[in-house]
């Protein structure tokens, strides 16, 4: 038994200068797990609650001392003495103790930090790397794959202070044979994009996720700049590198008139018109994945979009599904989208996250493991992507240490598996729904 002997919570700072919760779980034998909760900017309305203090005299109301107190008191008292290797039991104890549907009592930030720290401590007690332990918890011990990165190299929407409506323009280095090669291709395109933007007299300041955040005449302009950068780097768009977008449509959907208002372009679309706008972009550019291409509540619009694009484009539900199995189940039954974005803190525990990934895979949906715009040096999502053989990861651009921490962890894992004589496959484009 890997007995929990101590649980510690503290307030640390994330990549946006806001507080977040970090937890330590200590076991008998001196094993320790350390984990921090991330934080989103464009959030789905049905996400588990991130508990903030609301005390305007500290961190403009964004302190997390209440959540930290929950870790140090109620949660610690409930799980000290328990077996850390019973992850589902530890998570359920915290969920039951919180007693709310959306974890609003302790905060998903408190519960998640402890959940992940517990898994790390348990892995250490078994002498396993975290990805191997996650695979065991997932019922897929020894089954790994290296994820295809979706690299957000132009930031807009809520992630940048510019006039670009679509939140993320991403590249996928599908021509790579290994994760390390994919990162090299991504870095080369990123540096060439900086040159392209500079030559046009545009800003090369970066947004929350490390991508550039220039003012552009249109969303299509972002794709044109990326195309030029890919070619300047010596790669072929559509063969070596494909494109993906996160529209985060809920951020520019007007609930009062049901229109998608792209203020940066001065255009408004009905739900169906917006799907056809995206369809035209897909005809012009090799866009193989679109995330949140409709408002989270516009299920009719999503059903139409799935009918129009779903056979050839990966349609990822983020704000739509919020890593929640109840909502995902309904989406699967109604044929909404064909992929789910996986964010630990949308649901608030490792056990529930693994359940969402399993449900998606069982239904033939893909699962894309994702960071949040507010991150720390915690790289757990890298281990999650490998340990569940998810096939895809979204963790920002080729700048900002909070993003690079995840990529560097993936490099370490890929190398460790190669050295052990059990290299993990890198599926590339085959990992993307509709592209196999």
Swiss-Prot record:
InterPro entries: Enolase (IPR000941), Enolase-like_C_sf (IPR036849), Enolase-like_N (IPR029017), Enolase_C (IPR020810), Enolase_CS (IPR020809), Enolase_N (IPR020811). Its EC number is 4.2.1.11. The keyword Lyase applies. Its main location: cytoplasm. It is found in: Cytoplasm; Secreted; Cell surface. Pathway: Carbohydrate degradation; glycolysis; pyruvate from D-glyceraldehyde 3-phosphate: step 4/5. Binds a second Mg(2+) ion via substrate during catalysis. The keyword Repeat does not apply. Mg(2+) binds at residues 246, 291, 318. It catalyses: (2R)-2-phosphoglycerate = phosphoenolpyruvate + H2O. One of its GO terms (biological process) is glycolytic process. PROSITE patterns: ENOLASE. It is an enzyme of class 4 (lyase). It holds the Pfam family Enolase_C. Component of the RNA degradosome, a multiprotein complex involved in RNA processing and mRNA degradation. This is Enolase. It comes from Haemophilus influenzae (strain PittGG).
């Amino acid at each position: 038994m890997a007995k929990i002997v101590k649980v510690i919570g503290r307030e640390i700072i994330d990549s946006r200068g806001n507080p977040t919760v970090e937890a330590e779980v200590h076991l008998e034998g001196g094993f320790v797990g350390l984990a921090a909760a991330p934080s989103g900017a464009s959030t789905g309305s049905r996400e588990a609650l991130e508990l903030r203090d609301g005390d305007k005299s500290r961190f403009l109301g964004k302190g997390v001392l209440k959540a930290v107190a929950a870790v140090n008191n109620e949660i610690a008292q409930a799980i000290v003495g328990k077996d850390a290797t019973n992850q589902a039991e530890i998570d359920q104890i915290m969920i039951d103790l919180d007693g709310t549907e959306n974890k609003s009592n302790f905060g998903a930030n408190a519960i998640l930090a402890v959940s992940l720290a517990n898994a790390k401590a348990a892995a250490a007690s078994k002498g396993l790397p975290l990805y191997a332990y996650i695979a065991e918890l997932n019922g897929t011990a020894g089954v790994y794959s290296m994820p295809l990165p979706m690299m957000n190299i132009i930031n807009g929407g809520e992630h940048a202070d510019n006039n670009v409506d679509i939140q993320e323009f991403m590249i996928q280095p599908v021509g790579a044979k290994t994760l390390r090669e994919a990162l090299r291709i991504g870095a080369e395109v990123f540096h060439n994009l900086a040159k392209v933007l500079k030559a046009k007299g545009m800003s090369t300041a970066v947004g929350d996720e490390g991508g550039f955040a220039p003012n552009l005449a249109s969303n299509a302009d972002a794709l044109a700049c990326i195309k030029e950068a890919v070619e300047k780097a010596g790669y072929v768009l559509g063969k070596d590198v494909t494109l993906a977008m996160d529209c985060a449509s809920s951020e520019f959907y007007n609930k009062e008139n049901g229109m998608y208002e792209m203020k940066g372009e001065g255009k408004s679309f009905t739900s169906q018109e917006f799907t056809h706008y995206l369809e035209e972009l897909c005809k012009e550019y090799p866009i193989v994945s679109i995330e949140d291409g409709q408002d989270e509540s516009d299920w009719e619009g999503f059903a139409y979009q799935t009918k129009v694009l779903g056979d050839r484009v990966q349609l990822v539900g983020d704000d739509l599904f919020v890593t929640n199995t109840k909502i995902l189940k309904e989406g699967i039954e109604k044929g909404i989208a064909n992929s789910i974005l996986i964010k630990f803190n949308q649901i608030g525990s490792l056990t529930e996250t693994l359940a969402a990934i399993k449900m998606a895979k069982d239904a033939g949906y893909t699962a894309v493991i994702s960071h949040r715009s507010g991150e720390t040096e915690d790289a757990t999502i890298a281990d999650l992507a490998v340990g569940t053989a998810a096939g895809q990861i979204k963790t920002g651009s080729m700048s900002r240490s909070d993003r690079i921490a995840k990529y560097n962890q993936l490099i370490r894992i890929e190398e460790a598996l190669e050295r052990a004589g059990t290299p993990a496959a890198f599926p590339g484009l085959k990992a993307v729904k509709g592209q196999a």
